Amino acid sequence: MEVTLKEFRELCTSISTESSYVKKTKLISEFIHRGRDYNDVYIITKLLLPGTGKLIYNINDKQLVKLFSKIFCHDADEMYKYVINIGDVAYVIGSFLKKSKSVVDYATESTLTLHEVDCFLTRLSTVTRENDQIKEIKKIIPRCTPNDLRHIIRLIKHDLRMNIGPKHVLSGLHKDAYGIFKLCNNLEQVVQRSLEDNIKPLIELMVPLQPMLASACKTFSEAVKKCPNGIIVEFKYDGERIQIHKHDKNFKYFSRSLKPITPHKVTDFEELLDRAFPSAKNMILDGEIILIDTETNQPLPFGTLGINKKSMYHNACVCIFIFDCLYFNDTVLIDKPLIERRNIIHANIKEIPNRILLSEVKNISTDEELSKLLHIVLSKNIEGFVLKDAKGVYEPGMRRWLKIKKDYLDGCVMADKADLVVLGAYYGKGNKSGILSSFLMGCYDTKSEKWCTVTKCSGGHTDLELQEINDNLSVVPFDRNAIPDWLSINKIHYPDVIISDISLAPVWEIIGSEFTRSSTHTASNISIRFPRCSRIREDKTYETANNLNDIKQLYAVSISPPEE
């Protein structure tokens, strides 16, 4: 018998009211393994993780209100006032459905199946015109109770309000399912293998893996402890992460956030990669894409890969620095030592100057050798360097590498920049009157599952950039009497406006003179002194920005005493 939306709603309610993550996972496990077949388990898992799927609707709260106001024949502004006051667009739309009985027929008993809901969501993701969206919504409303509709809206918003993420959902499927998901990022494969109890390391060509990451490091002794098998130092250029997949004659390129790389950044690279790796039938490479000045052979600053910025540099071309190989000619390499993976690249690459290059590395064993490298970093346009265990395996999604960035080397007390999310903003005064000119920056606390405030940032933007931010930032007035459930904030930092949809909030790289303590900020009382925006991280999303655990680690590194 098919799983109904009502059963799914009841599961979500049980999960949302349970505070223990172990018990949340147990609820999911019991529901999933209740004699379900593959199709049921896959749909349940997919809908429990609406944010990890491939369905994109590009419909924010205002657009949802606009669509349903036309269906319900209600004033959109009136509906939206309720959304601002209550902070829950799904609840508001469900309530207005009840008020619209004379205009719209709706169900008094829930009979929708999850399969029907999944089909509706798939159709909705394929239409972009307002009239077509309304047409699809009108088809399903007669089958919906108000509670059904609320839940469907939450699926569209990728937020079921259960305070749970992929790790806990997939652990309910199989104890090792989350580890495999990080490798292949393919939910269908994970579900199938979990049900077959065939959980083995899985890499699928043309499907991105979670990239291996680096955490901040301040001293050589720390690096020695974390890299007991010898240290490989790799120069870190200020570019964009790229994961390259080749299968026969086909190529795909993925960003750090696992999204396809903008095509103009990788034009002509199929032919270049074939020349650089002539023996490769199939492969997965990890690297950094940057713009290089062809006259000086020096990398250009971050952000120059955009179409407009790139056109300003006439003597420049896009270059990919390859620093790792995860798969080569039908052989999975992630469990091989780094030295062996590097040797495979070295044996198979034919470098193309300024286009395809093997990243430069050094083997070091003493503090003196590290000091010499510091001078190279300071004298060149290099962001810093990454320290890697010479015999380390590739662990997708894990921060096992170490990084030392130039900002610390230049004398800044901060050991790292922080990638924070814009939570709200404040109107300026004087010549900036009426313009949002100061921004409330924050991070996500995985324990409380709330967004915490870190700092207020008003520097780093030109007037033109500030105007673009004002034009593009999606905000609503901040209501002091209806603070959103997702936000942890003290009264002193209440903004004038707040981000309307946290999933659409931009990520900015914030740098300052130092991390500091602040009793008024809610990110474990950690803040940043003299903050400024050093760049807008278009390659990151609210999900991949630094979370509170990252901020705590960065703070700890910044206050640890220097090595004598």
UniProtKB/Swiss-Prot annotation:
A divalent metal cation 1 binds at residue 288. The active site is at residue 236. A divalent metal cation 2 binds at residue 383. PROSITE patterns: DNA_LIGASE_A1, DNA_LIGASE_A3. GO terms for biological process: cell division; DNA biosynthetic process; DNA recombination; double-strand break repair; lagging strand elongation. ATP binds at residues 234, 241, 256, 288, 323, 399, 403. SUPFAM superfamilies: ATP-dependent DNA ligase DNA-binding domain (SSF117018), DNA ligase/mRNA capping enzyme, catalytic domain (SSF56091), Nucleic acid-binding proteins (SSF50249). It comes from the Viruses. It holds the Pfam family DNA_ligase_A_C. It is an enzyme of class 6 (ligase). Keywords: ATP-binding, Cell cycle, Cell division, DNA damage, DNA recombination, DNA repair, DNA replication, Ligase, Metal-binding, Nucleotide-binding. GO terms for molecular function: ATP binding; DNA binding; DNA ligase (ATP) activity; metal ion binding. Its cofactor is a divalent metal cation. InterPro entries: ATP-dep_DNA_ligase (IPR050191), DNA_ligase_ATP-dep (IPR000977), DNA_ligase_ATP-dep_C (IPR012309), DNA_ligase_ATP-dep_cent (IPR012310), DNA_ligase_ATP-dep_CS (IPR016059), DNA_ligase_ATP-dep_N (IPR012308), DNA_ligase_N_sf (IPR036599), NA-bd_OB-fold (IPR012340). It catalyses: ATP + (deoxyribonucleotide)n-3'-hydroxyl + 5'-phospho-(deoxyribonucleotide)m = (deoxyribonucleotide)n+m + AMP + diphosphate. The keyword DNA repair applies. Its EC number is 6.5.1.1. Belongs to the ATP-dependent DNA ligase family. DNA ligase that seals nicks in double-stranded DNA during DNA replication, DNA recombination and DNA repair. It is not essential for viral replication and recombination. This is DNA ligase. It comes from Fowlpox virus (strain NVSL) (FPV). The lineage of its organism: Viruses, Varidnaviria, Bamfordvirae, Nucleocytoviricota, Pokkesviricetes. The gene is LIG.
